[in-house]
Amino acid sequence: MAPRKRGGRGISFIFCCFRNNDHPEITYRLRNDSNFALQTMEPALPMPPVEELDVMFSELVDELDLTDKHREAMFALPAEKKWQIYCSKKKDQEENKGATSWPEFYIDQLNSMAARKSLLALEKEEEEERSKTIESLKTALRTKPMRFVTRFIDLDGLSCILNFLKTMDYETSESRIHTSLIGCIKALMNNSQGRAHVLAHSESINVIAQSLSTENIKTKVAVLEILGAVCLVPGGHKKVLQAMLHYQKYASERTRFQTLINDLDKSTGRYRDEVSLKTAIMSFINAVLSQGAGVESLDFRLHLRYEFLMLGIQPVIDKLREHENSTLDRHLDFFEMLRNEDELEFAKRFELVHIDTKSATQMFELTRRRLTHSEAYPHFMSILHHCLQMPYKRSGNTVQYWLLLDRIIQQIVIQNDKGQDPDSTPLENFNIKNVVRMLVNENEVKQWKEQAEKMRKEHNELQQKLEKKERECDAKTQEKEEMMQTLNKMKEKLEKETTEHKQVKQQVADLTAQLHELNRRAVCAAVPGGPSPGAPGGPFPSSGLGSLLPPPPPPLLSGGALPPPPPPLPPGGPPPPPGPPPLGGVLPPPGAPVSLTLKKKNIPQPTNALKSFNWSKLPENKLDGTVWTEIDDTKVFKILDLEDLERTFSAYQRQQEFFVNNSKQKEADAIDDTLSSKLKVKELSVIDGRRAQNCNILLSRLKLSNDEIKRAILTMDEQEDLPKDMLEQLLKFVPEKSDIDLLEEHKHELDRMAKADRFLFEMSRINHYQQRLQSLYFKKKFAERVAEVKPKVEAIRSGSEEVFRSRALKQLLEVVLAFGNYMNKGQRGNAYGFKISSLNKIADTKSSIDKNITLLHYLITIVENKYPKVLNLSEELRDIPQAAKVNMTELDKEISTLRSGLKAVETELEYQKSQPPQPGDKFVSVVSQFITLASFSFSDVEDLLAEAKELFTKAVKHFGEEAGKIQPDEFFGIFDQFLQAVAEAKQENENMRKRKEEEERRARLEAQLKEQRERERKVRKAKESSEESGEFDDLVSALRSGEVFDKDLSKLKRNRKRISNQVTDSSRERPITKLNF
């Protein structure tokens, strides 16, 4: 369908209110009683300064509703001309002051007229007065400043006019009042804001269309001009078609546009020589056909035109030629020219010159010829067949059946790809696109399904092969990476041991040289003097020297004498063994308390009793070697605001509002680790039905033959055919001795065995099948298990280091200790330390001012103000949450499982080495390489675990706890729970501060927003569109003359000025005089 853009170009020129080019000239209307003339007057007042004049002139220009271009032209005028225009406008406003200068007056009059249903009782003078009032409103809407129109719209003046139009009786509808009311709407649409308001109103176009029912020719002409102009507005074409459907129901028409064709055909009475109405009707019909979807869609133009042709418009057009009116002929020519072009283009689809749409035979033959030898032909025959079966009785719903069929076919033709109808469809929710989608040919669907199924199978096969190769590649890559990591670690360890070996070798050489030197000196000293008097039994030259070596400890000499002290060792050597205890004394046992001198604390005493902090004091005999020996809480008292602390946690003070909002300390739930369970193999018989069924399910999931499974086990699955989860399931179906014995008895019936039985039989032929399967499963799971264990070990190690080294934690404990000593009395006070579990009891102490405030909230506030470095606590203890999840007992079990599994694989490797090799068996080569790497990796894990346990023991003792009685999840869980409580309390404090600030900010902004809304409202009302009044008149004038459909746009531009200046019928338009500056 060829696009037709003839009308579009005319619109862009005429209806310039929707475009930014070709604006009409500025018209300035002045009223002097009932005559309009250009008033050239000399200003009576002296001209003010230029700055003041520009401000006054700007206010005047704002009321004229001008575009930016014309505003610039106005401001470019000389100062004298500006002052002359300003004085002339102000004088005119002074002369027209009165009640009629306010929109409220006209709205009251409209409501009063609408309330009076009949004009029969009215005197002629009263009727004339009301007509003048409506005419005055029309004039005011055209000539008053912009603020008048804006005020009229804000007061819902349009609804008042529409309500009057809907409720007027017959006499009023035939009077001049009706014509003037339509003129008011037309005048309102000359204004940009008014036009937008009319188009946006839900009922405006429908109510305007209802006025076509009047016999008043001038009213009909005005209505048709408005509707035709609205067709040219973006989105207005469909509104007009909807309005005509509305009028069909309102006027009880048989079909749409029936009244228009009837009026067009009337030629008797007052319609005999009436050309203006016929011109307006043809102008409207051309606008309906050529605008909206008709600009692009040939089918839509044919659809609408056929509706007019079915109403008999063509004979009427032939009769209208008798009027010999140039303007009417112009519209008639456009209608026929457009029809001829469309019918010619439509005929080209069938390779014809013309199609007789009046001939049912020709249209049927063209349709039959087009569909013959196509897949649609059977459906065409079915349509004809069912049309023959359609009921044809004169009574009943026969016409409605054909009407439904007609409307369905119309929708098929004119609906676009999105299922949208450019016309107002009488079939609601009828989307052709969705219907066609459901009626796709079944054969094509079947073919597509078969092709899709075939491609799906091929895709699945290729996907399985790809996944198999990817698994193989990933396994090889992982083994290579693990091997490289292990080799690098072995290299580092070897270099380290080599360096240590050299150092030890050098130390041995140095010690040997010292030993020879001491022997030489001892021999030299023993020869002249003989045995020592204090050592009966002869000299022991080797007893003193032997103490230099670490293995044997130095024995006690007879008589309880002390042995000689060992000589000093060279730098860097190992430490000497401990000396013997003093004579007659014994070393104290390891657990005995060591006396520690503790100075008495000088703790300030509160003036009133305080609420107690329920902590657990650490005994003084357990302070040695802990963090509490490094803490001095007495200096904290110099920083704390003790009066505020006493006031907040007084034991007798009444409750009142405080600075922290209601919050509850949340207790962290204990974290339960999942216990590892050992693989249990069901002891079932081979012939058991359930066991055989489960085995068959497993084999169907594997999608491997018995030979492929056997090859994978012998080669240690070098092609990655057996996933880890499948290996775990295969371990459940290891043939037991009873199964093997039973299968051996029936081995001669191998071909007749069931699938599960044959699988178990063939697997039993593999030497050490179960041990091989377990080794393969351990090999595949080893890296995963090590990867699970290492983060747990690392969490314990890093968590222990963090709590031991954290300065923020140490400072926090110091502050908490000061709080407790100040708040507690008697046995609960005067503490030098407390158990770390007491940290999670801080929140149990409630404030006496507000029960929702806890000691923890207060502590955080003090820390933020006095000890800001403590806020880095969560950063210094970042690994604590992970360490709190580690259960040492379960971790030891996992390490033990790895150790025993590795030992079992080594045992099987030794057994397989002793067996004669079988073809395709790669167990020895693959497992030997695996054992080398796995052993080193496991030893590395064990070293890390030993280091982690040592650091954990050190951390536990650092806080005064007993290492053997507390586990990592319990120890680190205390800190984790405390960190969570601190974060929550800190957030609650922050939320309270934000809420308080928000309330203050909202209060400040409330007044500002109120002032701003008032200012915006004034600006919005004062803001005026960039279009000139009178543009809607230009559009109607162009429609009336037919120039909107003219191909020659230059002619339209040349005639525009002439049309706008032409004085038209005084009953429809008043003269307009332009000011050209």
UniProtKB/Swiss-Prot annotation:
State the deletion phenotype.
Conditional knockout mice lacking Daam1 in myocardial cells show cardiomyopathy. Conditional knockout mice lacking Daam1 and Daam2 in myocardial cells show stronger cardiomyopathy.
Q: This chain belongs to which protein, by name?
A: Disheveled-associated activator of morphogenesis 1
The UniProt transmembrane annotation reads none
State the residue spans of region: Actin-binding.
693-702
Q: What subcellular compartments does it reside in?
A: Cytoplasm; Cytoplasm, Cytoskeleton, Cilium basal body
Q: Where is the FH1 domain?
A: 528-599
Tissue-level expression reads: In early embryogenesis, expressed in embryonic and extraembryonic ectoderm. In later stages of gastrulation, expressed also in somites and ribs and posterior vertebrae of developing skeletal system. During organogenesis, expressed in CNS, PNS, stomach, liver and limb bud.
Major location (coarse): cytoplasm
Q: Entry's InterPro entries?
A: ARM-like, ARM-type_fold, DAD_dom, FH2_Formin, FH2_Formin_sf, FH3_dom, Formin_Homology, GBD/FH3_dom
According to its UniProt record, which protein family does this protein belong to? Belongs to the formin homology family.
